[in-house]
Amino acid sequence: MKNLIKKFTIAVIVLSILYISYTTYISMNGIIIGTKIHKNDKSQFMIEEISESSYGQFVGLRQGDIILKINKEKPSDKHLKWGYLSHINSLDILRSGKKIHLKDFDLVTLNRPYSFFLFVLPLFFYFLSIICIFYILKVNKKRRSFAAYILILLLLDISIAYISAGGPFRGHIINRYINLFTFISSPILYLQFIQRYLGEIGKTFLNRISFLYIIPIFNLGIEFFQDYLQVDIDFLATLNLVSFATLTLFSFSAIYLHLNKYKYAEHSFILKLLILTNTLSFAPFLIFFVLPIIFTGNYIFPALASASLLVLIPFGLVYQFVANKMFDIEFILGRMRYYALLAMIPTLLIVGALVLFDVMDIQMNPVRQTVFFFVVMFAVFYFKEVMDFKFRLKRFSEKFNYQDSIFKYTQLMRGVTSLQQVFKELKNTILDVLLVSKAYTFEVTPDHKVIFLDKHEVGPDWNFYQEEFENVTSEIGKIIEVNQGFLMKVGERGGSSYVLLCLSNINTPRLTRDEISWLKTLSFYTSVSMENVLHIEELMEHLKDLKQEGTNPIWLKKLMFAIEEKQRSGLARDLHDSVLQDLISLKRQCELFLGDFKKDDNPCREEVQDKLVQMNEQMSDVISMTRETCHELRPQLLYDLGLVKALSKLVAQQQERVPFHIRLNTGRFTASLDLDSQLNLYRIIQEFLSNAVKHSQATDVLIMLISIQNKIVLHYEDDGVGFDQEKNTEHSMSMGLSGIKERVRALDGRLRIETSEGKGFKADIEIEL
């Protein structure tokens, strides 16, 4: 089905290009189709045949008229194309013995204003549609959307309906059928596109839309058998307009009802965009041409002029089909309602004044003038806001310019680094905008003591406002007005509140709603900025204290140890995946070679065999050492089975190599720890054992790890040589106690060491859970 519609779409594109080329040639040459000319016995040009709906009939020509002059010249073959009149500005004809001068041929000459709506705009619309079609085909190479082909057909349908609606080729019978079918079927194609488009995003719309094609086919049949049925041409025109209006209103209602049903669905914004484009496109044509013709027989604006906004439909659909990001339709609708309300009042005043003073243009009735001035006013208000936003034009003086002042204030807050700077910028902003001359900052303590913060300035007598200071501290942004100004809470810290007192030399008027809203916004911005500045100041003080103490904070130690463990793990993986695997492979090759070598008869066999055996043993030692190194760098058992199993393996490995006895007791350890804490405890015990091997000369080592209530206790004890803590500070550092202490601090624990020369070494570590 998709391949069939694809081929059909391509065929329609080719046929449309041929049709547009044909109509363009007719328009460029001003050929009046439907008005057949031939020479009579006297070699006079006579109108032999004229179609009912042709442009020749529209300008007043009748069958049997004899043409005396064309463009004030004697008729000749140069004024004919295919037997039809062409390039006509005026005609002098003879009818029933009377000479008649006809000159109303504006619609067939491209140098007239009417040609813009009859030929230029429709042709421009067609070429834009072709560009959009190629863009849709390009995008659809990846999407492979069925809706894309229906959208292409819709673009071509509206383009052909628009360009075939008028001009010198109106009398062409085939052109009339093409215009009728494409004109009435455009709302149906529109609904089919919406159905397919929503279906491809998983939404249902309408079923059996194809049955609606019965309406244009029925109208086409009546048009075809018009003479046989003896149907009046005015009735046919009304029937066609009623059919189009019915289908258009049906499509609009279907989309609206679907939106009302799924107003909170994720695709509701798509439906709103469809309703917007539908209304803007069809409403002018329906209101100013179709409905007036149906009910009164006269139109307000000509069909081609009122239908010019139909171009919004395909472009809106193309944008919706290819765009990755949509405009905010709620915002657009809100702005349109706002601009429409603003434009309505001056429009009614202007038109009312024109009617009252009787200065109305003859060609512009009150309805036309109302529409014209409304559109102009609407466009003026829209472009005014666009220009204001784009160039940030100052619509007011700096006083009372609340929005710009907030924007400027937030920009200034980005560069403040102290509380005094925050207060300074706040005071300057308020003094620039409001009718106050002075601003002061105060701190109100929890016991309602008022402290003046601007020490470098002469402060006011704030004792008059003691009660107001007590009442204003209830919430941030609260404002209390006094005779010559107001008080406002702008922030808090702990139990203290920061209050701004703004005064004037004279009694100030009451604050307006806009001013109160603006001040509250400023106070909230100030409160956030104060919190940030205070946090930064506290952090700087804390860093200074740490620098003086010469120790790193716990969070930094944890980070450093985490980075160290990550580096250890990476190195262990590299050793295991590269060096260790190469060694194992080399050892395997050596074993195979040694096995083959024993089978051969070689006088030097024993000597070479001994060397190979020695090399094999050395490789075994290297492999074993590499494995142990990988395990020490990254204790895989700890990651897989936990701390207790990893410690048991660590003690077992150490026991094979050390000259002393190691006892490990973890039976009462049941705490659940995160991986970082387990790694730190593992490294601490590993460091204790390493120190015992290097320095203790012990014969017995005891390690106990227990958990009691919300506490973890690690006890280490050996009977080695010990050391004097007071005299041997450097020695203790060399024993690795520095790393142990840092890890204990990272765990937020406490380390207690008992040792002296010749009396062994004891260490207790307590960690709160």
Swiss-Prot record:
Q: What else is known?
A: The DNA sequences encoding comQ, comX and the N-terminal two-thirds of comP show a striking polymorphism, which determines the specificity of the quorum-sensing system in the different pherotypes of Bacillus.
Topology versus the membrane: Multi-pass membrane protein
So what EC number does this one have? 2.7.13.3
Q: Which InterPro entries match?
A: HATPase_C_sf, His_kinase_dom, Sensor_HK_TwoCompSys, Sig_transdc_His_kin_sub3_dim/P
Q: Which residues lie on this side of the membrane: Cytoplasmic?
A: 1-9, 135-144, 258-272, 324-337, 384-769
Please, which domain of life does this record's source organism belong to?
Bacteria
Function summary: Sensor in the two-component regulatory system ComP/ComA involved in a major quorum response pathway that regulates the development of genetic competence. Plays a role in sporulation, at least partly interchangeable with that of SpoIIJ. Probably activates ComA by phosphorylation.
* Stretches assigned to the Extracellular side: 34-113, 168-235, 296-299, 358-361
For the biological process aspect of GO, one term held by this record is: establishment of competence for transformation
- Which PROSITE patterns does the UniProt entry name for this protein? HIS_KIN
Q: Which residues form the Histidine kinase domain?
A: 571-769
Query: What positions are modified (Phosphohistidine)?
Result: 576
Segments spanning the bilayer are 10-33, 114-134, 145-167, 236-257, 273-295, 300-323, 338-357, 362-383
List UniProt keywords, sorted A-Z: ATP-binding, Cell membrane, Competence, Kinase, Membrane, Nucleotide-binding, Phosphoprotein, Sporulation, Transferase, Transmembrane, Transmembrane helix, Two-component regulatory system
Q: Name one Pfam family in it.
A: HATPase_c
Q: Which GO terms describe its molecular function?
A: ATP binding; phosphorelay sensor kinase activity; protein dimerization activity; protein kinase activity
Q: What is the lineage of its organism?
A: Bacteria, Bacillati, Bacillota, Bacilli, Bacillales
Q: Which organism is it from?
A: Bacillus subtilis (strain 168)
Task: Return the protein name.
Answer: Sensor histidine kinase ComP
Q: Where in the cell is it found?
A: Cell membrane
The answer on whether this UniProt entry bears the keyword ATP-binding reads yes
What is the name of the gene encoding this protein? Answer: comP
PANTHER family registered for this protein in UniProt? NITRATE/NITRITE SENSOR PROTEIN NARX-RELATED (PTHR24421), SENSOR HISTIDINE KINASE COMP (PTHR24421:SF60)
Q: How is the protein altered post-translationally, as described in the entry? A: Autophosphorylates on a histidine and transfers the phosphate group onto an aspartate in ComA, thus activating it.
Cellular component terms, GO, for this chain's entry? plasma membrane
Enzymatic reactions = ATP + protein L-histidine = ADP + protein N-phospho-L-histidine
